[in-house]
């Protein structure tokens, strides 16, 4: 209140002193302070107390939940880690998988507790982007898919009721399931639940979520290209999809055959077309190091962003890793395969970042697999940081959306510093327009809108 605490360092110094003065048994966490703060106080201090502020820099909180362990219909890819405790392509030790295991992969419990955790460390949770992870979700039982999504949305609606009670003066720890059930939404039977699992009808909970204090503003599904046909995409749309991530991995049929992928380049291109025709945002996973070296991999990425069959809105770069239990592990042990080293991966991804267009977002660099489970390949978990450091050393500004977001810039701007830019390009039988609000040097991005005109009519994706 006296304005003494202005930085995180000031806060830590004051917390240590207060713990000594009060002879507390444990060091107070920021979550402890937020729990005791009033609504008005939270408004002024949450920014200072917020842990990992970049998580909600855009104003949207990302909540990733994982579906139950299952088998991919085609079998297992050559490089895929073997695990009985997680869905395909995961080891069970990734952060999202650990949370999934903790809550026995129950969608409601995963979603509710992740929102609660984010709220407790000072993040806004009024807008949620839900990411449903776990191999090929559209290949699971149809009733399971509907139940899973409805339970995630129900968790958001219920946490919205929690926020209403907090506004009335209650503490988060005191709000029980019985108190949630007293809300008019349930007591007036607006949202019907069915015993014994609190089952809700998807359409009912979607409607309830539209007016909830915790709304789902984005929903992402992970899938393979051969499980991204029109019927699969229509089903995802009905569940609320706004983005689909497809595991493209490579653009060469001969590599698909080597890795026992079970689909073709044609499937990847068709999946991209169906998703765009449906007005969905498209993220592609690409895996450098799959029986290719740096020169060939760089050419692959150049093709992805110049060939109209690809040109994704978003990109995840996952260098190929060797894990025990995979067929790739046996090949590596026999000397028949050698993945990228840390330095080779950094060099390649730096070159990739140099050629990225301004309309793509780099979502992730490197898998979340713990280094202790990686037998060979990139073991440094901060690969992305190493790439960005190298770009800084070379004085290179990556043009992708992620690198130019204004929230990541240590600079103050005036509205007059920005103007509207327009860039048009073609992709999969459609005309794309990328409208962006940027500074005059095109180095800081304040906002953007994607618009596309396709053969099925006009769609707007933002």
Predicted regions and their residues:
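Flexible, acidic/Gly-rich N-terminal and inter-domain linker regions that tether
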Residues: 1-110, 114-194
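Flexible inter-domain linker/hinge segments
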Residues: 33-60, 170-209, 213, 370, ...
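Gly/lys/ser-thr-rich phosphate-binding loops in alpha/beta enzymes
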Residues: 55-63, 67-83, 113, 289-307, ...
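Structured core elements
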Residues: 64-66, 79, 131, 220, ...
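Flexible loop residues that form catalytic
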Residues: 70, 85, 249, 320, ...
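Conserved non-cysteine loop/helix-boundary elements of the Radical SAM core domain that shape
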Residues: 93-110, 130, 134-154, 165-283, ...
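C-terminal accessory regions of radical SAM enzymes
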Residues: 336-450
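Conserved small/polar residues in nucleotide/adenosyl-binding loops
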Residues: 454-460
